[in-house]
Structure formats: structure tokens, C-alpha cells
From Swiss-Prot:
Lanosterol synthase; part of the third module of ergosterol biosynthesis pathway that includes the late steps of the pathway. The third module or late pathway involves the ergosterol synthesis itself through consecutive reactions that mainly occur in the endoplasmic reticulum (ER) membrane. Firstly, the squalene synthase SQS catalyzes the condensation of 2 farnesyl pyrophosphate moieties to form squalene, which is the precursor of all steroids. InterPro entries: SQ_cyclase_C (IPR032696), SQ_cyclase_N (IPR032697), Squalene_cyclase (IPR018333), Terpenoid_cyclase/PrenylTrfase (IPR008930). Its EC number is 5.4.99.7. It holds the Pfam family SQHop_cyclase_N. This is Lanosterol synthase. The gene is LS. It comes from Ganoderma lucidum. Belongs to the terpene cyclase/mutase family. The active site is at residue 454. It catalyses: (S)-2,3-epoxysqualene = lanosterol. GO terms for molecular function: lanosterol synthase activity.
């Protein structure tokens, strides 16, 4: 395929493969991010690079050194002087959302099998990204900080070869050696088996059945897929279709070469059915249960005699659900995995020239992020709302939002929040098994249209803070719209008082016995999360201060029930386990904030005291905290080799929310964070900050501004008050 011709490449990705002065970030009115390479000098002259372009590309942004801060508030002010220069004209902050190393292969394989190419500059920088994240042994992990796995190495090797990496390039040679040392691609986990089968370099007989017929079951059946966690069901819809039709790339020279390169034995001699449960030990996080293996035996028997009319009806049903998802999200879809699978479904069912296929082609770029290390595939189409929600709250709680210097920036943030609120339920609300969204805020953009309980919570708090505390701020979001957001939050509480992510819990937890993915934990049904629950508690508590007459009894009942859940979720050592950030520092900060808003602090609450003592016990000699992503895997505290600024801020803020009476731990944290601030007000990037499904780390690079500014500004006032009392 001419669009994927082999490329001449340097030995490493240390230097850019393209001219970074020619990259530009374009923003749609709704906040969609797309990177563009300008090939002519006239284009470059007509579209100058912005400060945020240069920053994300790792270029010199040309901002001046600031006066050295003499206290924490001045350090926070310097931090925001830097960060506001990266606020977009739309009012939000752009940023990467990378980290997982199985996303780019889906983009590349999904595009290749659909006959959709990339610009040469995009191909070059995607290869460079892979070069820059290869491990010392030549392989790739499940995320950028993880050890090499078959999943990461086989998929990224295929992606690099498709993009134009030659088989004899030193990076390819070393990657193959790593893969073969791990046993070759036969032991790739199920999602990898699926992608390699799509590429026609792994036989479909090596996959466990993916029965699309499950979608024909009555909705009331306990294992009906609409009850699964939304990311899982939205991936297995197109998976069921593509498995059902046995979609595969036509054989060509590259496919034939990969069949030789990926395996330690002859491709045509492999016993494919014997590979179905073969998962390399280095990849295995969630082994198959005996229940799942028994189910696979039954499904295998069914697959050998599946009724063609039933299979056709099931495939048709999966196609219908794919279209509903695409229409609900304008082909951005829930995330990049189901987005690329949906694209293949639409091309297979409708043809490459169909409107659906063309829209998918355009929407690929919403997930492609250009950074200092090359071009990556993001975990969603951004984290726009998530970032602005925290920054807006930080502006108010530090007092910076009241300063004339930052007022315009705060008002632009409010305008973005106004535009970003989801004003209606999804187009296909009931038929696509969606939860209500009218009044919610998304994680990224309202076009993508999915809300998470904590995103609506943080969005609501941000609006209330800005509209009530910024001088002269207009009431852009009406009381009715704020009440709509509250309605969404109240609709999401589960029976035990906790809040899950996207929806109510629809299936029993024993469904996790049927987790087929091997590399992820807690994916089969929704689970309650302390950090989601706390975001809702704090949002409702702040809302009722300003609007005390709306659903008063419902709000009180919800908060009381949620606090009961939070007490039960506290771990014996005193912290709360974080499922979306790393890890105990993250969740414990949110928990102590919410408890404080209902009157539970260090002086009044045993739970708060235990949490504070837990955090203080983990403070390091340098004054900071450092937690490894490994804590999320093993569900216990694991020290990072280095102190982390972001986690230090979470821990210090937790202590302040709890009204911890001793200043020394907070003073030491402030000193550590200030010591790492650069002269221009910024902080360098440190270790990865986020996580999902226990085993995959993901980046939140704007956290190093949002939480540092927030903590320093709060600490300045808090410490003054503590010392005044003494």
C-alpha cells in the first residue's frame, strides 16, 4: 500500500523527525483538538505558533523569569502566571492524555485495514513516539512506565512496521528479540489476539468465541451486555461484529512478513485453538476463572454449530448499536479503542466511501496528540473539562481568582464551562442503553457527550465557585441548569450509598468472574469509587449553600448515605484506595475534603484522624510524598523511587482539608514543592499521575500546575491561620 511505504529513519528518536516549527494545534468551538503540519512557508507565516503549541511541542516558549517567591502564595501566583499563558482562546487548557501503549496500535491497524492513510509527517512522528518509549530490552509495556509485555511489544512492533519501519532497522531487530524471548506473539492477551486477527497475522481460531448473540438476549437477563461496564460493552459490540464476520486484512507482502517475524515457530504449524487461553506470564494480571473457562467450553461448542440466521441477526444488532454510538458522539465514541473498532465495522458494512466511514476518518485526529516525544494516541479526545474543573477551583480557593491580573482568565474559564455543559440527553438515549446526561459535564467535550459522576461534580463546583466568587462574573449558567446537574448526580447513587463512574451499577459483582481481558481488573460491571463519591458529596454540599431550597431532603439523604459508604470504604491503615489516580494520596485527598464539608475534621472525626496519621506516616525526609503506580496493582502502598510533586500536593491538601493542627508536615511539603519550581513559574514533568482498571497508568500532565498552585495558595493562608492560633 503506497500510503505506508517503508521510510528511511534515524537510529533513535532523540531528535524530531519533522520540523517542529511547522506543527499547529487547531481548536474547534467545542474544544476538539487536532494537530496540523504546515508544509509551506506561506502557511507558517499566516498561522503563527501559539505559546501552548510551543509548550506541548517541548519548544522554548519564551516566557520571562519571574521574581523569586518569598512565600507559598507568591509561588502559586508565579505558577499561574506561567499556566495562564497556556490557556486557549476558548478558555480551557489543552493537553495530552497519553500513557497506555495499546492505543496507538489500534489507530494504526484500524486505519491500515480500512485503507486509510496518514500524512508522512504523522507516520514519522508516531514511529518516533514508539522509539522514545521503547524499553531497554527492546520491548514495550502496557503503558509508558511498565515493563515489556507481549501485548505491548507485539502490537507496537506491528504498528511501527505498518507505519514504515523496516524489519532490519536496529529498533525492529531488538524488539523482535524481546518478543521472541517472551515466547512470541502466540501468548498475547485476548485484546491483542483480536487486533492481530484483524491484521490477519493471528488466526481467528486462536481467539475464544466473542458471541454477538448475547445482544439478542432479553434485557432482563443478568448477564445481558447492557449491564456490563460501559467501556467493556462498547468494545465488545464491535468485537462481536468483527469476530462474527471473521474480518481480516487481505494478504499482502507485509502481512506475510509479519507472520514470520512475530513467532518463534512456523506460522502455519501453530495449533491455533490451543492458543486461546495462552497468555504470557508477564502479561497476566487477571487470570481466567474456572467459571469463564467453563463458559468458553460451552461457547466453543456453540460456535461449531451456530445457526446462520441467528448469527446474522446478532451481527445486524451489533451493527445497529455501533451506529447508535457513532451518532450519539459524532464518531468520537466513548474512547479510542471502540472508536477504531467501530470504524472498521462501518467500513465493512457500508464501504469506505460511506458518510460514516468518512466521518470516522476525520475524527481519528481528535485522539492524535503531538508532543515533544512524537505523536501518540490519547485515552480520550482530551481531558478538557477535567483540567478546567480543578484549575477553576484552585483559582478561588487560593484567592488568585480575585486578583485583577487573573480575572479575565477566570472569566474565560467560566465561558468554557458554560459552553461545555451537556444540555440534553443523548440522541439515542434508551435504545443505546445510556444514562441521562442533561445538565452533566463531560470528561472532555460535550460533543463526545459522556459524563462521569466526578466530572459533573467537579464541573458543578467550578461553576459555583466562579459565578459566586469572581468579581462581576455573569451568571452564565442559570439556576435551572445547575439544578439539572444536581439531578444527574442524584440519579447516580447506588444502593449502598456509593457512586460509580458512568452509570448505576447494573450487574452483580460476580460478573467479574467472567472478565476475559486478562490485563485489566474490575471491567465487567460498574464499581463504586471513593473519589467519585467524594466529588458528588462536595458538589452537593457546596450547591446547597447557594441554593438551599432545591431538593433539600434528597440532597441531605444522598450526602448522608454517601458519607456512610465512604466510612466503610476507608482502609484499615487509614487511607482510601484510588482507582483513577495514583493512588492513596489521590483518593484520600478527595475523601478528607468531602468529610470536612459535612463537619468531619481531625478534631471531630476518628476517620479523619486516622487518614491524617496515615498520610503523615508516609511523608519522606525531604518533605514530600512519592507513590508508585504499582500501588494500584497490589492495592497497598508502594513507594516510588522518587518524591513526586503532584502527590505531595494531594497529601498536603488532604491535611489542610482535615484541619490538621500541626503545621510542620505542611510546611515541609510547601518547601519541597517550591524547591522544584522553575524560574518561569513552571514545574517539570515527573512520573505518571493517573491509572485505570488497576493495571494501566495514564498521564495527566496539567496536574503539575493545577494541584501545585492550589496547594501552595491554600497552604499560605492555612499556615498563617495555624500560627495565629498559637
Amino acid at each position: 500500500m503506497a500510503a505506508y511505504a517503508p521510510l528511511e529513519l534515524p537510529a533513535s528518536g532523540a531528535l524530531p523527525f519533522t520540523d517542529y516549527a511547522r506543527w499547529r494545534l487547531r481548536l474547534s468551538p467545542n474544544g476538539d483538538h487536532t494537530w496540523h503540519y504546515l508544509r509551506t512557508d506561506d502557511e507558517v507565516a499566516a498561522w503563527p505558533q501559539s505559546t501552548y503549541d510551543k509548550y506541548w511541542l517541548g519548544q522554548d516558549v519564551g516566557l520571562p523569569e519571574l521574581p523569586p517567591p518569598t512565600n507559598a502564595l507568591e509561588a502559586a501566583r508565579n505558577g499561574y502566571r506561567f499556566f495562564q499563558k497556556h490557556q486557549t482562546e476558548r478558555g480551557h487548557w489543552a493537553g495530552e492524555y497519553g500513557g497506555p501503549m495499546f492505543l496507538l496500535p489500534g489507530l494504526v491497524i484500524g486505519s491500515y485495514v480500512c485503507g486509510m492513510g496518514f500524512k508522512t509527517e504523522e507516520r514519522l512522528e508516531m514511529i518516533r513516539y514508539l522509539f522514545n518509549h521503547v524499553n531497554e530490552d527492546g520491548g514495550w509495556g502496557i503503558h509508558i512506565e511498565g515493563p515489556s509485555t507481549v501485548f505491548g511489544t507485539a502490537l507496537n512492533y506491528c504498528a511501527a512496521r505498518i507505519l514504515g519501519l523496516k524489519a532490519d532497522h536496529p529498533v525492529a531487530v531488538k524488539a523482535r528479540a524481546c518478543l521472541h524471548k517472551l515466547g512470541g506473539a502466540v501468548g498475547i492477551p485476548s485484546w491483542g489476539k483480536f487486533w492481530l486477527s484483524i491484521l490477519n497475522v493471528y488466526d481467528w481460531e486462536g481467539n475464544h468465541p466473542i458471541p454477538s448473540e448475547l445482544w439478542l438476549l432479553p434485557d432482563w437477563v443478568p448477564i445481558h451486555p447492557h449491564r456490563w461496564w460501559i467501556h467493556t460493552r462498547n468494545v465488545y459490540i464491535p468485537m462481536g461484529y468483527l469476530y462474527g464476520v471473521r474480518f481480516k486484512m487481505e494478504e499482502n507482502e507485509l502481512v506475510s512478513s509479519l507472520r514470520q517475524e512475530l513467532y518463534t515457530t512456523n506460522y502455519y504449524s501453530i495449533d491455533w485453538p490451543a492458543q486461546r487461553s495462552n497468555v504470557a506470564a508477564v502479561d497476566l494480571y487477571t487470570p481466567h476463572s474456572a467459571v469463564l473457562e467453563g463458559l468458553y467450553t460451552l461457547l466453543g461448542a456453540y460456535e461449531s454449530c451456530a445457526l446462520p440466521p441467528l448469527r446474522r441477526a446478532a451481527i445486524r444488532r451489533c451493527y445497529e448499536l455501533v451506529v447508535l454510538e457513532d451518532e450519539n458522539t459524532d464518531c468520537q465514541d466513548l474512547g479510542p479503542v471502540n472508536k477504531m473498532m467501530n470504524q472498521i465495522v462501518r467500513v465493512h458494512a457500508e464501504g469506505r466511501e460511506s458518510a460514516g466511514a468518512k466521518r470516522h476518518l476525520e475524527r481519528r485526529h481528535d485522539f492524535m496528540w503531538m508532543g515533544a516525544e512524537g505523536m501518540m494516541m490519547c485515552g480520550t479526545n482530551g481531558s478538557q473539562l477535567w483540567d478546567i474543573g480543578f484549575m477553576a477551583q484552585a483559582l478561588i480557593e487560593t484567592g488568585l481568582g480575585a486578583e485583577d491580573e487573573f480575572r479575565e482568565s477566570a472569566l474565560r474559564a467560566l465561558q468554557w464551562l458554560d459552553n461545555c455543559q451537556i444540555r440534553e440527553n443523548p440522541k439515542h438515549y434508551r435504545t443505546a442503553y445510556r444514562h441521562q446526561t442533561k445538565g452533566a459535564w463531560p470528561f472532555s467535550t460535550k460533543t463526545q457527550g459522556y459524563t462521569v459522576s466526578d466530572c459533573t461534580g467537579e464541573g458543578l463546583k467550578a461553576v459555583l465557585y466562579l459565578q459566586e466568587h469572581v468579581k462581576g462574573a455573569p451568571k452564565l449558567i442559570s439556576e435551572r441548569r445547575l439544578c439539572d446537574a444536581v439531578d444527574v448526580l442524584l440519579s447516580l447513587q447506588n444502593t449502598d450509598g456509593g457512586f460509580a463512574s458512568y452509570e448505576l451499577i447494573r450487574a452483580p459483582q460476580w460478573m467479574e468472574w467472567l472478565n476475559p481481558a486478562e490485563v485489566f481488573g474490575n471491567i465487567m460491571t460498574e464499581f463504586n469509587y471513593p473519589e467519585c463519591t467524594t466529588s458528588v458529596i462536595t458538589a452537593l454540599a457546596i450547591f446547597r449553600k447557594h441554593y438551599p431550597h432545591y431538593r433539600t431532603a434528597d440532597i441531605q439523604r444522598t450526602i448522608t448515605h454517601a458519607v456512610d459508604y465512604l466510612h466503610k470504604a476507608q482502609r484499615p491503615e487509614g487511607g482510601w484506595f484510588g482507582s483513577w489516580g495514583i493512588c492513596f494520596t489521590y483518593a484520600t485527598q478527595f475523601a478528607l475534603e468531602s468529610l470536612a464539608l459535612v463537619g468531619e475534621t481531625y478534631e471531630t472525626s476518628a476517620a479523619s484522624r486516622r487518614a491524617c496519621e496515615f498520610l503523615v506516616s508516609k511523608q519522606r525526609a525531604d518533605g514530600g510524598w512519592g507513590e508508585s503506580y504499582k500501588a494500584c496493582e497490589v492495592i497497598e502502598w508502594v513507594e516510588h523511587k522518587d518524591t513526586q510533586v503532584v502527590q505531595t500536593c494531594w497529601a498536603a491538601m488532604a491535611l489542610m482539608y482535615a484541619k490538621y493542627p500541626h503545621p510542620e508536615p505542611i510546611e515541609r511539603a510547601v518547601k519541597l514543592v517550591m524547591s522544584r519550581q522553575r524560574p518561569d513559574g513552571s514545574w517539570p514533568q515527573e512520573a505518571i499521575e493517573g491509572v485505570f482498571n488497576k493495571n494501566v497508568a495514564i498521564s495527566y500532565p496539567n496536574f503539575k500546575f493545577e494541584f501545585t498552585i492550589w496547594m501552595l495558595g491554600r497552604a499560605h493562608r492555612y499556615l498563617k491561620e495555624l500560627h495565629a492560633k498559637k
